[in-house]
């Protein structure tokens, strides 16, 4: 996943931090953190002061993602690390990221602390399946949006709607349907789901999610 304010979610000397009695191994990198939660390895990395990339893979199953879309080399970015209760925080001069190492939830806010988007607690799912003899995963990620938040994007859809809230769309390029798993919010952020396989986008009062057939 890429967070653009910007954000990407790719579904795919260390400091050990113990927060509120919950021993969580959170390793600091130059511009982010890595940690394991809910049997998932997670990497949070600032690509610039306005771009955060989130990379998730099943625990101890590393996968080198050679994205056809995310070709940018991370810029040198000053990142401040801290703690907020049991959570770990990291921020640039534009974006604040708050990670719950226990639930896997991630909150993205602007520099004033206004919440932009939430990567939902326990919201990541990897489901194993056999892809023509090759072990693979279905992958699903859920987010929380504001009730009245308007989002645009998802490519060239033939629904006659501009606001993509409260819809279920099957994202696969065909005929006049050109699908791009990218949304832009009126709150001033954008989200790119870095996966090329057929994907179901769903938004309802409970959550917004991307559910991809293959963890590409």
Language-model regions, residue ranges each:
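N-terminal accessory segment at the very beginning of proteins
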Residues: 3, 21-216
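Bacterial N-terminal signal peptides that target proteins for export
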Residues: 1-9
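Bacterial N-terminal signal peptides
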Residues: 10-18
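General helical structural elements
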Residues: 9-10, 57
């Amino acid at each position: 996943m890429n967070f653009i304010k910007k954000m990407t979610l790719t579904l795919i000397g260390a400091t050990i931090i113990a927060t509120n009695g919950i021993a969580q191994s959170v390793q600091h990198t130059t511009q982010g953190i890595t940690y394991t939660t809910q049997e998932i390895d997670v990497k949070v990395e600032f690509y610039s002061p306005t771009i955060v990339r989130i990379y998730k893979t099943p625990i101890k199953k590393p996968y080198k993602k050679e994205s056809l879309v995310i070709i940018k080399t991370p810029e040198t970015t000053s990142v401040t690390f801290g703690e907020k209760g049991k959570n770990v925080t990291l921020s640039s001069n534009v974006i604040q990221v708050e990670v719950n190492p226990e639930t896997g939830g991630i909150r993205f806010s602007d520099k004033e602390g206004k919440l932009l988007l939430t990567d939902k607690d326990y919201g990541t799912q990897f489901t194993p399946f056999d892809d023509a003899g090759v072990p693979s995963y279905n992958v699903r990620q859920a987010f929380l949006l504001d009730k009245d938040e308007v989002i645009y994007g998802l490519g060239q859809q033939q629904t006659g709607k501009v606001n993509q809230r409260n819809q279920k769309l099957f994202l696969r390029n065909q005929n006049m349907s050109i699908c791009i798993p990218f949304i832009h919010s009126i709150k001033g952020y954008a989200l790119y789901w870095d996966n090329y396989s057929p994907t179901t986008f769903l938004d309802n009062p409970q959550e917004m999610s991307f559910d991809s057939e293959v963890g590409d």
